[in-house]
């Protein structure tokens, strides 16, 4: 059993355990909010009932990161966040710092590590061609992600009373200037629409611009979230509801996070694929929104719906996706 004790504006989860010699000890884990403490308390009690509860006892950074991913990452990270963070650990952190004892890691050690990364070849991206030699080194934005990951891991180590201070708190990062993202102006958009000959792509451009949709939200839009009835269009109330998104995720990461927030999994084309397409819930509740459609876009959607209904009837499929894409039909969509 575990209890929660509030002390100095901190919520402490307190529980007892026995060491290998049979001696009883008391453990305190500090959290900044009551919901976090309650979640940890429930997790401890559940694992104690199953007989699978273990006390975090980490000597090296590799051991800490293993506990951190298991206890924190699997419950807090989204699927792609899990893939990204475990990749940073595997490719950059573990080879350089993994065998260091926690007491040996200081702000100076981290700063030297960050400077060394600037001269370390970057791991190729999935989108790079196979066997392509990019010749690129790890960039400051990636180093910032690594720093944030280490900061979070050391913060958890503080809560578990494995370290007294967070060394990442005082480490200085390499200079980084954020580049402004180039965006289209209205003239460029209208020119692109005029030049576009693919009706599906033209509809995507109109939806993305008029509704400010991310690509995952656009491709994850389903007809049950679209109101384009004659009455709605006539009264200016035609709208869409954004409540899910299409995403490609790593299959192992999806299994590790227990398919968290996954609504639909699309069938795989190849047996050797490491990734799979899914429909998932948005990252935050704020991403769920109702967006009213301009009349011209609503009329374009009506025309597109008629064409898609004809296709579905011809192929004997039930396809609720607004923007269809070949070969990806969930089993639940096939009659």
Identify the meaning behind each predicted range.
Residues 93, 110, 150-153, 161, ...:
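Conserved hydrophobic/aromatic pocket- or pore-lining residues that grip, position, or stack substrates
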Residues 123-127, 133-140, 144, 159, ...:
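Basic, Lys/Arg- and aromatic-enriched nucleic-acid-binding interface segment
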Residues 122-123, 194, 198, 211, ...:
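Short, basic (Lys/Arg/His-rich) helix/loop patches that form interaction surfaces
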Residues 6-11, 17-112, 309-324, 329:
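N-terminal DNA-binding module of tyrosine recombinases/phage integrases
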Residues 3, 70-160, 335:
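N-terminal core-binding DNA-recognition domain of tyrosine site-specific recombinases/integrases
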Residues 64, 88, 109, 145-149, ...:
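Charged catalytic carboxylate motif
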Residues 7, 14, 187-188, 221-306, ...:
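Conserved tyrosine-mediated DNA breakage-rejoining catalytic core shared by Y-recombinases
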Residues 20-25, 95, 175-177, 282-287:
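Short glycine-enriched loop/turn motifs at secondary-structure junctions
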